[in-house]
Amino acid sequence: MATKARVMYDFAAEPGNNELTVTEGEIITVTNPNVGGGWLEGKNNKGEQGLVPTDYVEILPNDGKDPFSCGNSVADQAFLDSLTASTAQTNSSSANSNNQVGGGNDPWTAWNAPKPGNWDSSDAWGSRTDGTSAQRNSSANNWDTGFGHPQAYQGPATGDDDEWDEDWDDPKSSSPYFKDSEPAEAGGIQRGNSRAGASSMKLPLNKFPGFAKPGMEQYLLAKQLAKPKEKIAIIVGDYGPMWVYPTSTFDCVVADPRKGSKMYGLKSYIEYQLTPTNTNRSVNHRYKHFDWLYERLLVKFGSAIPIPSLPDKQVTGRFEEEFIKMRMERLQAWMTRMCRHPVVSESEVFQQFLNFRDEKEWKTGKRKAEKDELVGVMIFSTMEPEAPDLDLIEIEQKCDAVGKFTKAMDDGVKELLTVGQEHWKRCTGPLPKEYQKIGKALQSLAAVFSSSGYQGETDLNDAITEAGKTYEEIASLVAEQPKKDLHFLMECNHEYKGFLGCFPDIIGAHKGAIEKVKESDKLVATSKITPQDKQTMVKRVGTMSYALQAEMNHFHSNRIYDYNSVIRLYLEQQVQFYETIAEKLRQALSRFPVM
């Protein structure tokens, strides 16, 4: 009997790597468990076959029964959902396919507001998992750019702070294409890591103190909110509420990946040089430092601002140098996105990450950030909209409009990712082979003609041979073209898929707050709160609404710029591609005289 395995986490195949896209909960047939390098070969129920990471599946008993099918399956599934890894790789799901990326753990399936009636529990406000997978391509030129800044601080010492010595940061792709002789950078895909901050995991918001401790009621019903030192202003601009943008903007160049080691060379890691353009002073960070930053930003701003996950630590199916470049490219895109946000980029924790001067300053800032109390829904207490109060009906309408748009865009992005993946496969697989076949057939025909012994056909035979070689050249062009145009379009869509995956939780919190206000009439009737308390609740939910509208205006502004740029680039490269092919065909044609 064939061995069966249950998929524990969503996994998305990289184009051209002979991998198989699988969805959490899916049962696959193991066709070759001994591939090696942390991989096995499996086949899904559609007959599609490919490589799957061994850490992503659980081998089922010989009777084929799923050990998770008994007991409280709903509760089991809910628990697993809270730990499910969200992918950030090149092929994603369409809205209609559960076998593509995201199909088995769609954050939109449970974004509706929690049911009213339980004022004693704040679990409903923090139980949803955050959206993940933010990857967007930045300029490929950054791959090879080095900045020789001798003053670059090398990051916190790994031997002085135990919490920075955890093994989960030592990177190495578990791809079977890695050489066995490579020095040990801890292998294996880390989806099962228990650390809540691991970037490849979907993080339950109630695991963070900011989402569990300061509940929504604390924000809505507090008699008087403490006056925070930090203020986040919201103004009304030409397109509605908006964040206040800083007078000068900056980016951060991620470059110069270098291998470091610890424990006398027994463990190795990659660290990257970060150079903010506004200071031009470099600092070095390892991946787990980025992971720490992501966790702190999620804890602090995740109720109001979508904070997409870091690119996956593992980029599968790649040799080490290419893997490092790909991860650096995606870290660059993530940092650029954070630098472009007027609230995140100006936050103390983000500035600390980029501008610390020595190890002492780093550790002081790190611990201060971890003790920050203005996290979770309490971030709204720092916001001051310079706008009139909103009534509850308008607040609800604005929330519904955001939910409707982001859900529709999520579906559209997934569809484009699916189509793009299929096109990539055609361009790197069957299509070049067809051109190669035409080329070889033409050259074979020329060889046959040459064997005739007839003296007057040399020019024709040479022309046919060159035409055949032209088609072989076209085959190579077709196979390489996706890297020049489709790659950038796919990366942009992956980044937005990550952003859109964050909105169900944000919208869920807003809808829940609206429900709390609706329930407040009962509390007023029973004298548990005063009418003035209810008005305070409406005002504070209005502040949340202004924050949501400001964030959406920022989102739309970036969306218009990004998609205009990336689709323009795609079309420019396509035009150049077809013009190159046309020129080669013209040259081949010129060898055939008109008779």
Curated annotation (Swiss-Prot):
UniProt keyword Membrane present: yes
Residue span of region Critical for tubulation activity: 201-213
Similarity comment text for this entry: Belongs to the sorting nexin family.
Residues binding a 1,2-diacyl-sn-glycero-3-phospho-(1D-myo-inositol-4,5-bisphosphate), per UniProt: 286, 288, 327
Free-text tissue specificity from the UniProt record: Detected in inner ear vestibula and in the cuticular plate of cochlear hair cells (at protein level).
Alphabetical list of PROSITE patterns matching this protein: PX, SH3
Keyword terms of this UniProt record: Acetylation, Cell cycle, Cell division, Cell membrane, Cell projection, Cytoplasm, Cytoplasmic vesicle, Endocytosis, Golgi apparatus, Lipid-binding, Membrane, Mitosis, Phosphoprotein, Protein transport, SH3 domain, Transport, Ubl conjugation
Post-translational modification (record): Phosphorylated on tyrosine residues by TNK2. Phosphorylation promotes its activity in the degradation of EGFR.
Quaternary structure and partners: Homodimer, and homooligomer. Heterodimer with SNX18. Interacts with ITCH. Interacts (via SH3 domain) with TNK2, WASL and ACTR3. Identified in a complex with TNK2 and clathrin heavy chains. Identified in a complex with the AP-2 complex, clathrin and DNM2. Interacts (via SH3 domain) with DNM1 and DNM2. Identified in an oligomeric complex containing DNM1 and SNX9. Interacts with FCHSD1. Interacts with ADAM9 and ADAM15 cytoplasmic tails.
GO CC annotation: clathrin-coated pit; clathrin-coated vesicle; cytoplasm; cytoplasmic vesicle; cytoplasmic vesicle membrane; cytosol; plasma membrane; presynapse
Modified residues (Phosphoserine): 121, 200
SUPFAM superfamilies with a match to the protein in the record: BAR/IMD domain-like, PX domain, SH3-domain
UniProt modified residues of type Phosphotyrosine: 239
Region (Disordered): 89-199
Protein's membrane topology: Peripheral membrane protein
Name of the protein in its database record: Sorting nexin-9
Compositionally skewed regions (Acidic residues) per UniProt: 159-169
Disulfide bonds: none
Ranges of biased composition (kind: Polar residues): 129-144
Domain notes: The PX domain mediates interaction with membranes enriched in phosphatidylinositol phosphate. Has high affinity for phosphatidylinositol 4,5-bisphosphate, but can also bind to membranes enriched in other phosphatidylinositol phosphates.
Chain's gene name: Snx9
Ranges annotated as biased composition (Low complexity): 89-100
